[in-house]
Amino acid sequence: MTSTIRQHAATRTGFSSVTRTGRTVLTVPARLCFIVEERYENDVMPGAVVDVLRSWGHEVDVLRPNGTVADLWDLLFTGSTRYDAFVLKTVSEGPGLTLLDAAGAAGITTVNDYRSIRLARDKAVAAVRARAAGIPFPKTWFASRTALLDQIPADMYPLVIKPNNGSSLKDVYRVDNPEELAQLDIDDSTRMLAQPYLVNPGYDMKLYNTGDEVFATIKRSPLHPGADVVEEQIPVTPELRALALAVGRAFALDIYGIDVVETPDGYVVLDVNDFPSFGMVPQAAERLARTVLRVTRRNAIAAATTTTVDSTLVPVLEATA
């Protein structure tokens, strides 16, 4: 195993549950690998989840893809540590996503499902997935180069412009006319999205699903930086809960967040995040740790009772009221 993974092999005390077919169901305690890129090393998430899992007696290693060459055969097939699941916290197109895809291709559980993460992270694909599922989502244009955005008709302004692979609300702009669009200083090689600006109260709502419950918060909007906004947790109405669960089903995500705005025509989803910060969510680390273990156990049992690989993307959301 690579040197950047914190190993605990010398103190392994777990055992494996084995079915009558001889296939391993799940090691107890669970053996997990978190893939965490440099940007998130000092963030609360996912470090707090790692700490909780370790405090419960599970064995958790942390792989930093920016600091090592990963021996894929050792990591996924022949190494002394056989992981029950991999958990990803990376930037949109970081190298960690390739490692998670590799784990999924090897038949190992990933949280979230590696195919679901791809659906959510490509914002153009996410927009289409949401629209196809009947989820309210803004009309979306995709441009392979920034310069192509000037082909959007002038009567569609104002527009919201953002990178197709953006994260953390960076480089999100409102432009009221083609002249303002031309003034944006954006690398022309950047793949961009454009969506009509939707009238809203001046703040965003963030819905979080920890896998067992939905939470709602009010967050500042990058389009209204001067607005007087109190960021706080708010009650989850039945409508908001239904919207959050619909997104989970459409993308087959277990843990996720969505950005929502309230418009004159109702709530509209703006973005889907496969592993957000879960800010202001009570006991977030404990809730997420339980979901990681539940998904790992569920998938291990399912794998032990089937003889074929099911490549169909299916909903895995288990949120309850």
In which residue ranges do the predicted regions lie?
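Extreme N-terminal starter segment of soluble prokaryotic enzymes
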Residues: 28-33
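Short N-terminal or domain-adjacent regulatory/targeting segments
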Residues: 1-26
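Protein kinase-like catalytic core scaffold
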Residues: 159, 193, 215-216, 256, ...
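A long amphipathic alpha-helix within ATP-dependent nucleotide-binding catalytic cores
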Residues: 224-269, 273, 281-305, 309-319
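Rossmann-like NAD(P)H-binding beta-loop-alpha module
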Residues: 138-157
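Short glycine-rich anion-binding loops that position phosphate/pyrophosphate groups of nucleotides
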Residues: 91-93, 165-166, 275
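Conserved N-proximal alpha/beta basic substrate-recognition cap immediately N-terminal to
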Residues: 38-139
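Phosphate-binding site of ATP-dependent enzymes
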Residues: 170-251
